[in-house]
């Protein structure tokens, strides 16, 4: 029995040290050395302080900011610990009700906007955490944001164009706008009706 138990226990402890301690430390060290920003969470800094991550969306509800995709992570929007397959099936009546409710909320926030609502403003991404919207979704919101902030519409549209990321190598992915980065750039603008 000792002849069988001893090698099994030695192997157990050796593999535990290798896979539970040595390997994670080596991978973490390599990540910190080779990709320090990504290893730290791909943080977006403002005045040296983290304001978010480039990988996870945030819940903007103020009409003076651009809004991201709906989060499907339950009562706490953009909760990374609740991420997962989140969209309802296309035949589920609850999906239709949710989309109608989101369209109504968008129309109420900008009653003069008769344009079709872009689909990414009313449906959640697969993870429910997507930080990007389409350029069409940003353009749809531009008039509301300009009006609330007292900015010229053309200035807001220029900002959207400036913050639009193109497909990688010109062919992989879609054009997209990072909502947090767009809102930070928007916050840096001075409204026309601002004092001083």
Swiss-Prot record:
Keyword ATP-binding recorded: yes
GO molecular function: ATP binding; P-type potassium transmembrane transporter activity
InterPro entries: KdpC
Annotated localization: Cell inner membrane
Topology relative to the membrane: Single-pass membrane protein
Transferase among keywords: no
Organism domain of life: Bacteria
Pfam annotation, one family: KdpC
Membrane-spanning segments: 7-27
GO cellular component, one term: plasma membrane
Keywords: ATP-binding, Cell inner membrane, Cell membrane, Ion transport, Membrane, Nucleotide-binding, Potassium, Potassium transport, Transmembrane, Transmembrane helix, Transport
Chief place where the protein resides: membrane
Signal peptide boundaries: none
Coiled-coil residue spans: none
Family: Belongs to the KdpC family.
Protein role: Part of the high-affinity ATP-driven potassium transport (or Kdp) system, which catalyzes the hydrolysis of ATP coupled with the electrogenic transport of potassium into the cytoplasm. This subunit acts as a catalytic chaperone that increases the ATP-binding affinity of the ATP-hydrolyzing subunit KdpB by the formation of a transient KdpB/KdpC/ATP ternary complex.
Complex formation: The system is composed of three essential subunits: KdpA, KdpB and KdpC.
Protein name stated in the entry: Potassium-transporting ATPase KdpC subunit
């Amino acid at each position: 029995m000792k002849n069988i138990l001893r090698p099994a226990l030695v192997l157990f402890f050796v593999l535990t040290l290798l896979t539970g301690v040595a390997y994670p430390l080596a991978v973490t060290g390599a990540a910190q050395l080779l990709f320090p920003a990504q290893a730290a969470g791909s943080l977006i800094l403002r005045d040296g302080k983290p304001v978010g991550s480039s990988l996870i969306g945030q819940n903007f509800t103020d009409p003076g900011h651009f809004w991201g995709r709906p989060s499907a992570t339950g009562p706490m929007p953009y909760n990374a610990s609740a991420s997962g397959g989140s969209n309802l099936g296309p035949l589920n009546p609850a999906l239709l009700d949710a989309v109608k409710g989101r369209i109504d909320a968008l129309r109420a926030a900008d009653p003069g906007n008769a344009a079709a609502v872009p689909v990414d403003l009313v449906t959640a991404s697969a993870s429910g955490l997507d930080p990007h919207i389409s350029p069409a979704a940003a353009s749809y919101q531009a008039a509301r944001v300009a009006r609330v902030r007292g900015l010229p519409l053309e200035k807001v549209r220029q900002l959207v164009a400036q913050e639009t990321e193109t497909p990688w190598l010109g062919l992989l992915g879609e054009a997209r706008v990072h909502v947090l980065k767009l809102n930070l750039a928007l916050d840096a603008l001075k409204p026309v009706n601002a004092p001083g």
